[in-house]
């Protein structure tokens, strides 16, 4: 699945990741997934279709969970977007929640991982919806550095972490 998406998008190997939730042990219908990828990439994939992506990942969710922010850091402004799925089996530690955060900030991957882990511990990992747990959860923070604005100071890191908390309360 990843290789087909990478090929259609013109990306290199290991630049696409696949996530899923569902019945544990039940295999995904790979042929249907591949058919969907082949249909959606040329027809709908565009910067303007973020809301459609947030809608597409919904399963039992009743509303789209998405947000976009501009955040002032010590050296400039960055954009941050997020979308998530998950409405049940969220207790504790995210459970079946899948979260995707993107930013145009520039940062060292190790620093981003530390910042994200600390932020998740104080936000997403404290969510409880129904008391049910699951084995499927993920949060991804993708930073392309396009703004050239670097996450440098402790205040910058705190501001980024605070957004995770804000998103958790909004979602």
Regions found by a protein language model. Name each.
Residues 14-35, 128-150:
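Short, surface-exposed loop/turn segments at secondary-structure boundaries that line and modulate
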Residues 4-121:
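Glycine-rich, mobile lid/loop segments that gate access to catalytic sites or pores
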Residues 144-163:
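A conserved active-site cap/scaffold subdomain adjacent to cofactor or substrate pockets
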